[in-house]
Structure formats: structure tokens, C-alpha cells
A protein has these predicted regions:
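Pyridoxal 5′-phosphate
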Residues: 1-281
């Protein structure tokens, strides 16, 4: 269920001859901490898991998993993709037990094209490319200072209000779920206890791209999955036990603190209108 930015790295490692163990959700659509810990053995040197799934909002039990792994296998390097969780759900680098944490600016109102990698003290990593001495010699090339400054400003603005925004956006998620529950042709693909910032639903009988184009005409812009895999069928939903038919009609609704219940009302009204018009056409 990992993002392509991580998944493709491990695919390349596998092509180079490394053994890669991939963990899929169980029949209940869950990945437990036991699943993650049991995948590690004496030959493992790297574990990488996302904190929040970018298509469904599912939250993985990283803190408990990595805490146990570090006790059993202290030399294993742990990485966590926190792009969908940073400034949205509480993250404590001390208790997360991740040696490496990757975050990105474009998910938190910062400029696109800027991110950061947290490296725990004592963790040794190789240079990502050769050249100058920028970024402590890890990544050469002239830094995009406006982007970096914008990312820093976003952190300063949004970090103090993580809890308040989480509670508010949780109310929006609840409002949306209640609003669509009266329509048996809309299926909820996200779990109730996942991140409130992402809700994945399926409009039965209508392919994602058709509904998305209809919503665009109403100035409502959502997506059918990961923006990095536009036009490609999602394999993530299938991993969570969602059928091919529902996956083909899945759309992802993403919230932020500036959204309101009026936005949700407009979305649901448009879904109803689109459902009636598209199926009759």
C-alpha cells in the first residue's frame, strides 16, 4: 500500500538482487503491528512503512511496530513516510522510533517541490547525488531558498494548531459520512478511525474519471487516487479488500482547515446530480 516514491525504490532494490518483503492488509483490511514485526528477521537491514495511506487515510501502527523492532533488531534502519501525516496527526520523533522520516511541503500549504528528511543522530546515509557540499554534503545543488522559506513558514503557522485542526477536520469527515450514508449507491472505502483529512468513496456504476469531470464542471476538484499515478488503476484499494468495480469508481476527498460543511453539501448535491444524469445518459 506504499506510495510509488517508496514502492519503486524497493522494486529497484529487488531488481538488484535484494530480498524485499511486502506487507498487505489482512482480511479485515488491517495491518497490525505483529504483521510488521513478524516480517523482520536477522537478515533485515531496512524497514519502511508509511504513517498515513495517501489514498484511504489508513493509519499504520508505526510507533508500536518500530519500538518492538528496535528492541529486537537494534541495527535495523527504520524509515517512515510521514508526508500525509506531518502537521495533520500528532508525530513525536522520539516515540516514533524512525531513523529516517520523510515529509513534503505540498501537503501542508507550502510550495511544491520542497521536502525534508529527518535523520536520527547516529544514522549514516550515503549521498543522494554527487557535486557540491549543499545540505551537509548529502544532496548537492543550489537550494530553492523561497521554497524552503515557504515550508518553514507553513510549519510555524500550522504546527501550533495540529490538535485543533484535527478535531475540526474530524467533524467534517463525520459530516460527510453522515451525508452520504442515506445513498446506497455510495460506498465508503476509508475506515472511520483513519486520518480525517482523507475520505475515499465509490459512486457505484460510474467510473472515477467520468464523475470527476462532472464535478469539475461544478468547480469541485477532487481526485481518483494518488496524483503521482494519474490515469493508472490503483492497486492500493484492492489490497484493502475493495473490489475491482468499486476501485474503478473510487474518488478521494481531501480536507483542510479552510473547508466547511457548505463545501460538503455542495459536493454531495453534485454527486447526487451527477449520479442521476450520468446513469440516464
Amino acid at each position: 500500500i506504499e506510495h510509488a516514491s517508496v514502492k519503486e525504490c524497493f522494486n529497484e532494490l529487488e531488481r538488484l538482487g535484494f530480498e524485499v518483503v511486502r506487507i498487505s492488509p489482512n482480511k479485515d483490511g488491517e495491518i497490525t503491528y505483529q504483521d510488521i514485526v513478524n516480517a523482520v528477521d536477522d537478515n533485515t537491514f531496512l524497514v519502511s512503512c508509511m504513517l498515513v495511506n495517501n489514498e484511504t487515510g489508513y493509519i499504520l501502527p508505526i510507533e508500536k511496530s518500530y519500538s518492538i523492532i528496535k528492541k529486537l533488531y537494534p541495527d535495523v534502519i527504520t524509515h517512515c513516510d510521514c508526508v500525509q501525516g506531518f502537521l495533520k496527526v500528532p508525530i513525536n520523533v522520539r516515540t516514533l522510533k524512525a531513523d529516517l522520516i520523510s515529509i513534503s511541503g505540498h501537503k501542508v500549504h507550502a510550495p511544491k517541490g520542497v521536502g525534508a528528511l529527518y535523520v536520527a543522530k547516529g544514522t549514516r546515509i550515503s549521498k543522494s547525488n554527487l557535486g557540491g557540499k549543499q545540505e551537509k554534503g548529502f544532496r548537492s545543488g543550489t537550494e530553492a531558498l523561497p521554497n524552503i522559506a515557504g515550508f518553514g513558514s507553513a510549519v510555524e503557522v500550522f504546527y501550533p494548531t495540529i490538535k485543533e485542526r484535527f478535531e475540526y477536520v474530524s467533524s467534517l469527515k463525520e459530516y460527510l459520512i453522515n451525508s452520504i450514508s442515506k445513498y446506497n449507491w455510495i460506498s465508503l472505502n476509508s475506515k472511520l478511525d483513519g486520518s480525517p483529512y482523507i475520505v475515499n468513496i465509490s459512486v457505484r456504476g460510474i467510473r472515477s474519471e467520468i464523475m470527476l469531470h462532472f464535478l469539475e464542471e461544478k468547480n469541485i476538484y477532487i481526485s481518483s487516487g494518488s496524483a503521482c499515478s494519474k490515469g493508472e488503476k490503483s492497486g492500493v484499494l484492492g489490497q484493502f479488500g475493495i473490489s475491482d468495480k468499486l476501485s474503478d469508481s473510487a474518488i478521494r476527498v481531501s480536507f483542510c482547515e479552510t473547508n466547511t460543511t457548505k463545501d460538503i453539501d455542495a459536493l454531495v448535491d453534485a454527486l447526487v446530480e451527477g449520479y442521476n444524469k450520468i446513469l440516464k445518459s
